[in-house]
Regions:
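Recognition helix of helix-turn-helix/homeodomain-like DNA-binding domains
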Residues: 31-46
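Short, conserved beta-strand element in jelly-roll/cupin
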Residues: 119-121, 132-148
C-alpha cells in the first residue's frame, strides 16, 4: 500500500518555519503567488520544475518534500514494500494528475539525486507547457512509449531507450499517444 505525501503542507510548514510569507517565496522562486497558494493548499499538483525552484529558495533538497524519514547509510527500496507516491502534473488542477512518482530513495539523508519510477498516464493533451530548472535528468523507458520535448527537438523513446539531458533547457516528458508508460528517472538538482 502506498502512502500519500502532502507536498503542499510540507512547503507551507517549511516556509512558515523560516518566517517567510508567500509573496517572498513567490518572488524568489519566480512563481506566481497564486501558484504557491494553490500548491500549499493542495489544490494544485505541482510539476517537478516548480518544486525544485521552491526547494532552492527554502534551502532544502527536493527529497524533503517527498518523504518523512531520514536515515544514514544505504537505503534499500524493495519491490514488495510500500513506496512513497506523489502525483505531479503540469495542468491547472489536482484532477489532472498525469505522473505518479514512486521514490526509490525514501529515507536517504542528504541525497544529491532523486531516483524515481514514474507511471505516466495518458492526458489527451496536444500542447505541453515546457519547463526548466537547474540540474540534469536521466530517463530510461521501462514500459510503453515516451515523448520528450527538449528545446526545439522532440525525441520518441521506446522500451529500453534512454535520454540524459541538462534540465536548464526547457523540456517536457509525457506519454506518447493514448497509452500509459513507465520510466526510471534520475533527477539531479544542485542544492
Amino acid at each position: 500500500m502506498t502512502k500519500k505525501v502532502s507536498v503542499g503542507g510540507k512547503i507551507r510548514s517549511l516556509r512558515e518555519s523560516k518566517m517567510m510569507d508567500m509573496e517572498v517565496l513567490a518572488e524568489r522562486s519566480q512563481l506566481p503567488v497564486e501558484q504557491i497558494k494553490a500548491i500549499e493548499e493542495d489544490n494544485l499538483l505541482p510539476g517537478l520544475a516548480p518544486l525544485i525552484k521552491i526547494a532552492r529558495v527554502l534551502g532544502v533538497r527536493l527529497g524533503t518534500f517527498l518523504d518523512d524519514s531520514q536515515g544514514m547509510g544505504a537505503v534499500v527500496s524493495r519491490n514488495e514494500e510500500s513506496k512513497v507516491s506523489v502525483r505531479f502534473t503540469n495542468h491547472s488542477s489536482a484532477d489532472n494528475a498525469s505522473m505518479i512518482y514512486h521514490s526509490l530513495s525514501e529515507g536517504k539523508e542528504n541525497r544529491h539525486i532523486e531516483p524515481f519510477v514514474i507511471d505516466i498516464l495518458p492526458t489527451g493533451e496536444q500542447n505541453y507547457a515546457m519547463s526548466s530548472h537547474e540540474g540534469e535528468e536521466f530517463i530510461y523507458v521501462l514500459e510503453g512509449k515516451v515523448e520528450v520535448n527538449y528545446g526545439k527537438q522532440t525525441y520518441l523513446l521506446e522500451k529500453g531507450d534512454s535520454i540524459y539531458y541538462d534540465s536548464i533547457v526547457k523540456h517536457h516528458v509525457h506519454g506518447y499517444g493514448d497509452e500509459s508508460a513507465r520510466i526510471l528517472a534520475i533527477v539531479y538538482a544542485p542544492f
